[in-house]
Amino acid sequence: MSRVGSYSDDDVAGWLSISPELGGALGAFTDAVYNRNRLPLRVREIARMAVAEANECAVCLGTRDRSGTDAGIDEHFYDHVLEWESWPGYSAEERTAAEFAHRFATDHTALRDDEDFWARCHEHFSDEILTDLALSCALWLGTGRVLRVLDIGQTCKLTL
């Protein structure tokens, strides 16, 4: 049951109307992350799911991208997210994105200070891609936590 308003368990967007200015800004940020960033789809999805697992957000965990199949993303890709360090179906670039996202969500100050990680990260990603990854993780972490804390849309399954 939603902690704000009286929205059904599968309504993931109605609550934004309570705060139209901020809700509209969040909508624009969401659109930018999903439609204008430069992350390869598999990189975006592994990072998104690593944050979703950390947030325990049912909406995020149940969301899929309709163009995923064309990018080689199937349910096995999603089933092994918690095994990002070892599952052979992920590339080194995808593992690095998953590590970034996981640590962004669970231990951000240690991530900041880990020079070995940053050296590995820069082997795979340009500053532009890293910026897109960081901003995307910020959206997923913040929005996922809001949805979870306010118990909004937790039975909703989305296709992007």
Q: Locations of the language-model features?
A:
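Mobile cap/lid helix-loop segments that border enzyme active or cofactor-binding sites
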Residues: M1-E45, D65-T69
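Iron-sulfur (Fe-S) cluster-binding segments and ferredoxin-like electron-carrier domains
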Residues: G23, L61-H80
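Alpha-helical scaffolds flanking conserved acidic
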Residues: P40-I46, F77, R95, I129-D132
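Short, thiol/selenol-centered motifs that function as redox-active sites or metal-ligating centers
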Residues: R44-S67
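Short alpha-helical scaffolding segments that buttress acidic/His motifs in well-ordered protein cores
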Residues: I46-V51, V81-L82, A97-A105, L133-G144
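Acidic/His metal-coordination segments adjacent to aromatic residues that form catalytic metal sites
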Residues: E83-Y90
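Acidic/histidine-rich alpha-helical segments that form the ligand environment
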Residues: E93-A134
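Preference for long, well-ordered alpha-helical segments
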Residues: D127-L160
